[in-house]
Design a protein with these regions (language model features):
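Hydrophobic/aromatic beta-strand patches that form the interior of the parallel beta-sheet core
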Residues: 139, 212, 240-241
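P-loop NTPase motor core of the ASCE superfamily
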Residues: 5, 9-23, 28-31, 198-202, ...
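P-loop NTPase motor domains
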Residues: 1-209, 225
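Active-site-proximal loop/turn and secondary-structure-junction residues that shape catalytic pockets
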Residues: 147, 217-219
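Structural recognition of the conserved hydrophobic beta-strand(s) that form the central parallel beta-sheet
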Residues: 210-216
């Protein structure tokens, strides 16, 4: 989840540092939530609720006191594991400006869960993503155009988890994995880059995952995945259906993909005294 929420970016020195720190902070706060939940369940407390991204967002913004004091309060909980407390203390040890930048990077994608509707919708689930090859089901994920930009991150997260959970075990290794699963992605590029999809497209068919994507042009795919990854994605689709292009560049590309065919025709001409037959290739 952290890799989807905090992608690599341009890999420059500062950017890489803050990306790594945001991921580490996300994991530390996630551990804190899960360990608190496990403790509450052991004590049979009525407030014991499964951890959610909404809860993690609220944990990341604190309770109103200075953030360093809030994080230190979390780290001082003796009932948390050593690894969780160590990660929280490492975050507290950062300089003020650095800590502020790390927390800004951490909270940026989690800001989606400030929306109470999204928070409520992602606080429970009706399906388990690792069951799509075990049970016959159809799952629709519908986003209206006015919410597409806002929901793109959530859609990437869902499909990343779906692919991750279903490329761990081959059907030959588990007889309960009986059903192929088709991922039909309309307006594929509108959800942005899904790194795990670009990495797994060459072998996911072996796990009975089928991929059907709909795009407007190859230029869209190039813009999101880059020329090489876009070509790799297109190549790993067994069939491509091309409709009449609107742009000359797409027309040339499709023409090159289709290649040329030699047609042989015979032409015969006859005069008063002579007859001539010619075979032409075109």
């Amino acid at each position: 989840i952290a890799q989807v929420l905090y992608p690599e970016g341009d890999n420059s020195g500062n950017q890489r540092f803050f990306t790594d720190q945001a991921r580490n902070s996300f994991v530390a706060l996630g551990l804190c939530l899960f360990e608190r939940h496990a403790r509450d369940r052991r004590l049979q407390l009525p407030k014991a609720q499964p951890p959610t991204l909404g809860q993690l967002y609220r944990l990341s913004i604190g309770d109103g006191r200075p953030m360093r004091d809030w994080l230190q309060l979390l780290a001082d909980d003796d009932l948390l594991s050593d690894s969780c407390r160590t990660s929280l203390r490492a975050l507290c040890s950062q300089a003020d400006d650095t800590l502020s930048s790390i927390l800004g990077s951490l909270q940026a994608p989690l800001g989606l869960w400030a929306d109470p509707q999204l928070d409520a919708a992602t606080s429970g689930h009706d399906i388990a993503l690792d069951q799509v090859r075990r049970q016959r089901m159809t799952v629709y994920l519908c986003i209206t155009p006015d919410r597409l930009e806002q929901a793109a991150l959530l859609v990437r997260l869902i499909f990343s988890l779906l692919i991750r959970d279903n490329t761990r075990t081959l059907p030959e290794q588990d007889p309960t994995l009986r059903h192929p699963c088709l991922l039909l992605l309309d307006e594929f590029t509108s959800m942005g880059r899904i790194d795990i999809l670009a990495q797994s497209v060459s072998y996911m068919a072996g796990y009975q995952l089928r991929l059907l994507t709909v795009i407007q042009s190859m230029a869209q795919l190039d813009a999101v995945y880059g020329a090489e990854q876009a070509r790799n994605l297109a190549t790993n689709h067994a069939t491509q259906i091309l409709f009449a292009p609107r742009e000359q560049q797409d027309a040339r590309l499709y023409s090159e993909m289709l290649g040329t065919t030699t047609q042989r025709r015979q032409q015969r001409s006859q005069g008063r005294d002579t007859s001539h037959t010619e075979i032409l290739d075109s």
